[in-house]
């Protein structure tokens, strides 16, 4: 019978038996210096059925750390740099999708409430007030646990609980625009309410909507990272929050594994700041009143 002996440098039990720290690379400890090494095999072969033949084939060594870039590996031996790069795409996709859906819902609700007025405005604004009073994070945690862990579910939940602010902003702008002369002229010419909202009110609120769209993106990215850090994100997708969650769960915080902690944290901070600066710049360019105050 043929048997193969395999020693994996990522094996935690192997590190424990060799007295090596969880975050140390065994090759750096076992082969600390350059040069020739002698490998000694000790075995005790006994068989009641006859002689035993032992065959030793060429031994191969693979230095894992040399194959995984500057950020090293995590507890599973996975390349952290690759996870960080892939997580950038996921963060942008989640932030853009959730912000776009939220702005679409908020713009529609705010424009209808502001233009129609009366009981429609009252009902829609009371719904907005109720949702604003609800603590968002606990609700997201409960709903995320109920509907499953997937990127699509996270995007939908983030969008459904982040449109209320833009709805109020668009409503106030619509209340001002519907009293303008060009809107009154459109009403006098027999234009429908839908046509007036789409053709006259929406174009005049687009600068405000676009600026708020950009500012909604970092909020969605940070909220998704928080959910992933709490273990409510998709376990199959290496998001930045998932990287931080793995580092917390498997000792990265206690061992101060900076290559595991700092990159996703800095990525979240820098990307959020970038969108905040872009949003402020867009708001200053498209909003004359904001430019005058600045």
Question: For each of these PLM feature ranges, what is it?
Answer:
Residues 1-76, 294:
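Membrane-topology segments of multi-pass transport proteins
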Residues 73-294:
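Alpha-helical transmembrane segments of integral membrane proteins
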């Amino acid at each position: 019978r043929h048997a193969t002996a395999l020693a994996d440098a990522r094996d935690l039990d192997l590190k424990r038996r060799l007295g090596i720290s969880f975050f140390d690379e065994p090759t750096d400890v076992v082969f600390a210096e350059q040069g020739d090494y002698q490998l000694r095999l000790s075995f005790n072969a006994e068989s009641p059925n006859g002689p035993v033949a032992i065959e030793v084939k060429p031994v191969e060594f693979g230095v894992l750390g040399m194959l995984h870039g500057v950020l090293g590996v995590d507890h599973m031996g996975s390349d952290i740099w690759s996870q960080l790069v892939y997580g950038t795409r996921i963060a942008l996709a989640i932030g853009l999708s959730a912000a776009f859906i939220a702005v679409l819902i908020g713009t529609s609700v705010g424009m209808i409430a502001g233009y129609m007025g009366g009981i429609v405005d009252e009902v829609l604004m009371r719904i907005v007030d109720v949702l604003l009073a609800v603590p968002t994070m606990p609700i997201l945690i409960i709903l995320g646990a109920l509907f499953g862990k997937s990127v699509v579910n996270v995007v939908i939940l983030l969008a459904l609980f982040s449109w209320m602010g833009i709805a109020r902003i668009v409503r106030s702008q619509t209340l001002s625009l519907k009293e303008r002369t060009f809107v009154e002229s459109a009403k006098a010419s027999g234009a429908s309410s839908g046509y007036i909202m789409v053709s006259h009110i929406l174009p005049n609120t687009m600068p405000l909507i676009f600026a708020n769209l950009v500012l909604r993106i970092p909020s969605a990215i940070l909220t998704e990272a928080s959910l992933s850090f709490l273990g409510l994100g998709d376990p199959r997708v290496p998001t930045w929050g998932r990287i931080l969650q793995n580092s917390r769960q498997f000792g990265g915080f206690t061992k101060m594994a900076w290559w595991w902690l700092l990159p996703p944290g800095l990525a979240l901070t820098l990307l959020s700041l970038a969108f905040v600066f872009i949003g402020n710049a867009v708001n200053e360019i498209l909003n004359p009143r904001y430019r005058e105050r600045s």
